[in-house]
Amino acid sequence: YWQFSEKIYSRDLQGIFDPDLGYLRKKIESSLDYSGEKSLDLIFYYSGEGTTYRGEKVLLPYDADLKNQYSFFPLKKLYSNLIEIQKMEEVGEITLFMDVDFNNSAFQQYIVKPGELVEDPKAKKKKKKKKKKGELETPVVTLPKEIMPPESITAFYASNITQITYDHPDMNNGIFTYYLLRGLRGDADNGDKNITVAELHDYISKNVQDTTKKLYKDLPQVPQLFSSNPDRVLFRLP
């Protein structure tokens, strides 16, 4: 377990995830030496801002500057670095928890309300159900390819790329993070003491959507999950 809680600059992200000489690789090696274990799984939690820069999704370090393309940290670079690290025989599963808002107000935004989504004209039209009076529009969920990780990486994202990621009104973190922590403490468990990827996502997704619909009505937040093995056990409760 280790954390970075101060301002993260572009050089920090470069130094952390460099697959050959980076902090992460060194930390893996030292952790295994200390624990005596032969392998470990990696779990990353990141809370911060993102945007679209030159057509791709990027993380915004503290020193991000539109005039300097190297001050951004592309998601595809994060993924490629993690794939290289995963080639280490000591590294098993990699799981990301990304409480990231890709619509930072300082950059171009791509916020879309559910009612503004354009249907694919080639898609088969389904008969719409009549909404009850006062019933909120159900957001259309499509997994955004722009943030899709390689198949061997499981990634939980706080929202879709066309949505705002909200802070919790009463806590010092995001609504996604709040329910992530509650889920890991046991609220996501179905009673067998094993919290799977799917259980955790279902719990987070339901509660984040319910909370943001109440608070923000037509601009809800819908968490996203990318996983090739949703039944994998993430955490075992005592």
Describe these PLM feature segments.
Residues 1-8:
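Signal peptide-proximal N-terminal region
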Residues 10-18, 63-71, 164-170, 188-191:
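Second-shell loop/turn segments in exported
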Residues 19-47, 51-111, 193, 199:
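Caspase-like (clan CD) cysteine peptidase catalytic core
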Residues 53-54, 149-151, 175, 229-230:
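Short, solvent-exposed loop/turn segments at the edges of secondary structure
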Residues 94-171, 177:
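Extracellular S/T/G-rich loop segment that most often corresponds to the catalytic His/Ser-adjacent loop
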Residues 187-238:
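Caspase-like cysteine protease fold
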